């Protein structure tokens, strides 16, 4: 193992993004606390902001071989807080059905705030960063051994995400407006709905990961949350960018991408990665041997999705440009 893969990377640039996110969440925490006169908002958003900052910082400074552990720290901190404190102890239904129930009832509690800020409004800033850094379902599934999908996406199977989303919405409308059954807040019924729903997610998520050999299969094919996130993430301020003058087209980023995005296709078009499937996990940033991949702020948007589907090779060496001897050595090492 090379020294670089064992070395900590204590460079100033790795402290910038964690600091920005910490400031954003602390601002939200203090603002809502003062507006609502409720200390819950101060604790809630401060904890989430600190957890995100810790995970992002660790992801940046840890040795390359274990950078993924930084993201796991945030996933477990935020995920356990949401599940244990809000879901189990607070008896709030943090599933999407709970959000629909509370929204139609006009109730502004933890679950409502979580969806409106993290999964809808926040996507205009950090895209689907929730999925990459805070989802409690994938916090467990990411411990499975299939981090790098090999076969590509199954065409049209992602349509089930929309079936799930509108099915959940229809179920809530039916229960509330046809059966006239309004859930009681912080009840055992809400807790049961939350626990049973999560159990189903974990079982189905594990089965999909096992049979498709892809930890993120449930994200791609069944989870309804991306339906909420897609509009905002298309126009998010923070996105992945690949600097063409530094890229040697080794395709390490595409080989490691857990969401099967053809990252270099965006580079060839002179654009940042506009795919709504990007979860801002930063894997591509930290596997790049030439530091060509970066997480940048800007204003753009687009609707073209460049994704790798079943049967396509992990990477095509198209448009390879002449590279220096030192860059060739890097590519040869990666391709062994």
PLM regions and their residue ranges:
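Non-ligating segments of multi-cofactor redox enzymes
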Residues: 1-267, 276, 286, 291-336
């Amino acid at each position: 193992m090379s020294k670089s893969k064992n070395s900590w990377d204590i460079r100033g640039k790795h402290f910038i993004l964690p600091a920005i996110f910490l400031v954003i969440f602390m601002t939200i925490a203090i603002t809502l606390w003062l507006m609502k006169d409720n200390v819950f908002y101060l604790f809630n958003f401060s904890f989430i902001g600190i957890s995100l900052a810790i995970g992002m910082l660790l992801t940046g400074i840890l040795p390359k071989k274990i950078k993924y552990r930084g993201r796991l720290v945030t996933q477990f901190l935020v995920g356990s807080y949401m599940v244990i404190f809000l879901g189990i102890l607070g008896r709030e239904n943090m599933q999407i059905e709970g959000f629909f129930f509370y929204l139609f009832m006009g109730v502004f509690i933890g679950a409502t705030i979580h969806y409106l800020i993290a999964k809808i409004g926040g996507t205009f800033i950090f895209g689907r960063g929730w999925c990459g850094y805070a989802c409690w379902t994938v916090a467990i599934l990411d411990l499975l051994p299939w981090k790098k999908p090999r076969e590509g996406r199954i065409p049209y199977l992602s349509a089930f995400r929309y079936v799930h989303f509108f099915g959940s919405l229809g179920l809530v409308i039916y229960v509330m407006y046809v059966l006239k059954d309004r859930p009681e807040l912080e009840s055992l019924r809400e807790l049961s709905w939350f626990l049973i729903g999560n159990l189903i997610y974990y079982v189905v998520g594990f089965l999909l990961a096992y049979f498709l050999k892809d930890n993120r299969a449930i994200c791609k094919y069944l989870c309804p949350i991306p339906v909420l996130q897609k509009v905002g993430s298309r126009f998010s301020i923070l996105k992945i960018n690949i600097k063409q003058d530094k890229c040697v087209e080794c395709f390490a980023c595409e080989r490691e991408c857990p969401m099967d995005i053809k990252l270099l296709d965006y580079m060839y078009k002179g654009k940042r990665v506009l795919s709504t499937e990007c979860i801002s996990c930063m894997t591509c940033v930290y596997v790049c041997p030439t530091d060509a991949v970066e997480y940048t702020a800007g204003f753009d948007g687009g609707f073209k999705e460049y994704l790798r589907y079943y049967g396509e090779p992990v990477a095509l060496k198209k448009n390879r440009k002449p590279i220096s001897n030192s860059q060739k050595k890097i590519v040869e090492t990666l391709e062994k």
